[in-house]
């Protein structure tokens, strides 16, 4: 079981100070790498449709998966033809290109990819080379906008809009790896098009063995439950259950962990509540104690208005460029 170091989220700490020189070196490497793309010394793949990148500058969960689900479905509802590309973290397919289906194996394409595909109505491709994934989407599906899931630092993929998500821990101590949780300096947020705070709304709790069997949120009050989470920010999940009144016995696992039946060998009959990402990998277990806690992203109205105005304008501009207008 792994979790982010506590000192990452403390303003001052001895270990953070000791690691600061390495953090400074890391920042230099990140800036040089990004600069090589900016001046054209490294190739950037460009495409005839808008590429929307959703990501973050911190290590760990920032609510990307629920947000991408919302964005893909909202684009579809508004008449667009979206597609999604991802690296397929946690699976083997990041070494080769693969189209994701509802029946894809999380071991092959990653747990997040399977969860996304079960909740969106658009094509999705996973591959380490996101540019190749976009080309495959455009060759085989009539997409007019592509969402890049967790590709903020994947500079070889050209982009038209960048959305950075921030979770409840914000930027931690404000330092880059390894002294802090930042993948890039915090000044990177000044260059993205949108910064959206993570906000998740509880949807439902259902039994894995029989999804028709649900638990009302009111039933959680004063109920002792095992909360199991192999996600980037398990503390957020535990806090959600506690806010609903549950007495939580927390079991954090490393992100993208693949469970075994013995992981649930607790010495009691308390319910075991999993995140959606974890539940995807536990449906084979014949255990009536296993329940899934599903959530939805809550997205600010102002962002929605600004984003859809921009994406419509970008599509029109790219169409005009293709037609030589």
Curated annotation (Swiss-Prot):
One of its GO terms (biological process) is lipopolysaccharide core region biosynthetic process. GO terms for molecular function: ATP binding; tetraacyldisaccharide 4'-kinase activity. Transfers the gamma-phosphate of ATP to the 4'-position of a tetraacyldisaccharide 1-phosphate intermediate (termed DS-1-P) to form tetraacyldisaccharide 1,4'-bis-phosphate (lipid IVA). Its EC number is 2.7.1.130. It comes from the Bacteria. Disulfide bonds: none annotated. Pathway: Glycolipid biosynthesis; lipid IV(A) biosynthesis; lipid IV(A) from (3R)-3-hydroxytetradecanoyl-[acyl-carrier-protein] and UDP-N-acetyl-alpha-D-glucosamine: step 6/6. It catalyses: a lipid A disaccharide + ATP = a lipid IVA + ADP + H(+). ATP binds at residues 58-65. It is an enzyme of class 2 (transferase). It holds the Pfam family LpxK. Keywords: ATP-binding, Kinase, Lipid A biosynthesis, Lipid biosynthesis, Lipid metabolism, Nucleotide-binding, Transferase. GO terms for cellular component: plasma membrane. Belongs to the LpxK family. InterPro entries: LpxK (IPR003758), P-loop_NTPase (IPR027417). This is Tetraacyldisaccharide 4'-kinase. The gene is lpxK.
